[in-house]
Amino acid sequence: MAVILSVDPCYAGLVGLAEGFRTSNPPRIRECIQCLQAILQFNPPPATQAKTHLQIGRILQQYTKNDDLARRTLEKAVSAELGHGYEEISFEASSILSLVYKDQGQYPLAKQVLRQALEITSGENLYFWQFRLFFQLAEVHACDNEFTASVEVLEMGERIAEQCGSQYMRYNIRHSHNCIIIVLLIMKDVNRVSNILMSTGSFLERWQGQSYQRESLVVFHLLLRVWQLLSVGQAKTVRPYLKQLQQSIQNLTTMTFEGMQPGPNVYEAEKFEWLPREHLCVLVYLVTVMHSMYAGYMDKVLKYSAKALNQVERLKVTSPSALVSVFQLMLLEHTIMCRVVQGQPAHAIKEISQVYQTLKHENCLVRAHKPILHTLLGLYAMSMNLMEQATTHFNIAFKTADNPVLANFVGLNLSIIYIRAGESKQIELSSVMSSIHPSNMATNSHSLQAGYYYVCALRAFFQTRIQDAKKYLRESLKIANAEDLNRLTACSLVLLGHTFLASGNPQEALNMVLPATQLSGKIPDNYIQLWAAGLLRDLYGMLGQPVQASESFHKHHSITKQLIENHMQARKLPEHGLTEWTGAVSPTKSSTIPPQQSFQTWSQPGPSRLS
């Protein structure tokens, strides 16, 4: 007993000192871990040793990249033989250890440690940990593409929620269950997905739970609804649901996690939060950014991305995780596409470099995000008129993308490059066009269908099949107008103007290009404005309107000059060397660009890319 008493003050002092180092600005993680390791030198009781190993493992997992040391440390905490009353140490260690296994791609080990922990909880009323472990196990199965097993785990969790009388957890699990079903169906059966979400919505209407709990589930439900509609490119249809979601998250931020439903079991269950309020806020920002990108509101993309990224930076300090890094990557991806559209290549390549550096330090995210990185580099290279590099990156992304939406998006941009290349790329063009044909698409995306018809029109125009081009453009415009896909509408109108000009009808061509000019100015999209200004200059000249022709000439000249300056600025940056990176080796220095490859304006129609 004397030994224990002599250790306790040391233990408390070292833990307090470690926490001081952890919470310092910046955190002093090395010193924090050294303090915790010093506790073990006193040979404390097994429970104290296990808790200390848990604390060290948690710090290593959250703040360092030393996954192997975190794994070994947490395995000691999990394997410790502790008596009754210390179960939470084992559960938390198992929970964090499964995250380490998952990040390393060791899915069987992650499932094993979670199932072993769940076996211990099955005979106890430890509902908080049961639900946390159920959710984690379902997530691991989903990451391993075992969606049926993931659904079965969540169904088990729902039965536990019914047993303990927690309506909150029952609907929380049902939403997660539906989320996986939506992932499986969204590419094939949009109507069934809508029915599932309507059914869940009716459950929420009937359930009169605590205000905070109910509002958090409403946010979750609306997030799924908005995400589902955006996934199929319905920017107009999603608008009322997005407004509801934004109002709901505002309501949630003003609430506190107040009184629970009566009953000890229910109270224990409803302490659980799978997605904290701070994460929900970032997700709402993210879907708002996605909607703005689809609808062509580039200023809003930058505005909401900046707000969300600020919140992500705070989360990386207070609760760092791979999920927070995913939020950061997705926001950066949309910001980069916006920069490319607006003709800001220097900003774009710097932010692409941020994505590259994040993936370099987050190995668990490389598989999902590397094809996206190549896509972003392809869009950047395409906007810089580096078609060889753009083709290389798009082909890598096209072959490695697991997401059919991304693959189709890449295929559309790759097709534009091949169309511009002429006869030399007809075989490659036919192959890509066949794979992205609507009948072969694994998705019912309105935006991708409209994009496909636009690319078909561009191909027909280059082959001087003017009537076919008009036919495809009418299909593209019908879909784009119905869902407020403004960039695609502007592109289609300018190309339609070219078809009317080729048919000898300059006045009708003018009627198409003028609204496209206004629309591209609102976006704003410098490349479409440049394209439209060049066509307007020629049209006004043909129609005998010299003043308007002169205005269009000066606008074309001004945009061209600004883009040339922006491109030259981007080429001087060391990050520009990423255009030469193919994924085999890390880029260490910028590439040398021959002077003859400087920016050129295309005389032929078509935007530089379909981002």
UniProtKB/Swiss-Prot annotation:
Subunit structure as annotated in this protein's UniProt entry: Component of the cohesin loading complex.
Protein purpose: Required for association of the cohesin complex with chromatin during interphase. Plays a role in sister chromatid cohesion and normal progression through prometaphase.
Native species: Nematostella vectensis (Starlet sea anemone)
Keywords noted in UniProt: Cell cycle, Cell division, Chromosome partition, Mitosis, Nucleus, Repeat, TPR repeat
Keyword Cell wall biogenesis/degradation: no
InterPro entries given in the database record: MAU2, TPR-like_helical_dom_sf
Record protein name field: MAU2 chromatid cohesion factor homolog
Biased composition (Polar residues): 585-611
Source organism superkingdom: Eukaryota
Subcellular location(s) per record: Nucleus, Nucleoplasm
Family stated for the protein in its record: Belongs to the SCC4/mau-2 family.
Mapped TPR repeat ranges: 11-46, 91-124, 131-164, 371-404, 490-523
GO cellular component assignments: chromatin; nucleoplasm; nucleus; SMC loading complex
Pfam hit, one: Cohesin_load
Main location: nucleus
Region Disordered, annotated ranges: 581-611
Alphabetical GO biological process terms: cell division; chromosome segregation; maintenance of mitotic sister chromatid cohesion
